[in-house]
C-alpha cells in the first residue's frame, strides 16, 4: 500500500511539561510521507492551550471547551484526519515518534489494516515501573482477547495505527468518551474483521509524580467497557 500522507492525532490534557518536546519529536520523526499533525486540547487548565496556539499556524489545533475525555478528543481528531494512515500519539513522552516507520511497515507491505505497538513483544528498551500496572494491563488484555477472539499482547498501548479505510469503517461506531476508547477500538477492529499486526516498541513509562493520570478506577471501568463494547454494541 502506498502512504502519501500520515495523520498523527495527539490528544492533550494538562501536558505543559512534555508538550513541546513531544511535538518537536513528532515533527522530526523520519518519515518519507507527508505529515498531518492534529492536536486536540481536551479542556486543559494548565499552559497546554497557550503552547498549542504557538503551533496553530502550521498544524491543525482543536480546542474543546471543557474536559470531555480521551475518547472524545480522539474521535474529533479522527474525523479531521485526511491521511492514508492514522497514528495515535500521546503527549506524555512515554512513546517515541522515531518508531513511526516501524509501525507503518505491515501496512506498507499490504499485510495489515491496523497495527498495534506492543510494549511486551519487543527488543527495544522499556522502563521498568509498577507491577500492578503490568498485571492490570495483562488481565484486561486477556479479558479483551477472550471476547474478541484476537491474540493481542498489549490492548492498552497508545500506539495504534489505522489505514484510512479501516478508520472510515469503525469511526461511525465509536462512542467512548474517556479511556474506554482503547477497549472500544479493539472491539470494533474485531467486529469489522480487520487485519491486525503487532510491532515491538520502546516504552518510557511515567510515575504518578511525573504526571501519570490513569489509576485503579480506570482499570475497573475498563472491565465494564470490555463487556459493554463486545456484547452490547454493534459493529
Where are these regions (language model features)?
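Hydrophobic helical membrane-anchoring modules
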Residues: 1-6, 17, 147-150, 173-235
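A conserved acidic beta->alpha catalytic loop
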Residues: 41-49, 93
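Short loop->beta transition adjacent to catalytic acidic/histidine clusters or analogous donor-positioning motifs
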Residues: 3-6, 27-38, 47, 59-60
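Conserved donor nucleotide-binding strand/loop of the catalytic core
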Residues: 35-38, 49-80
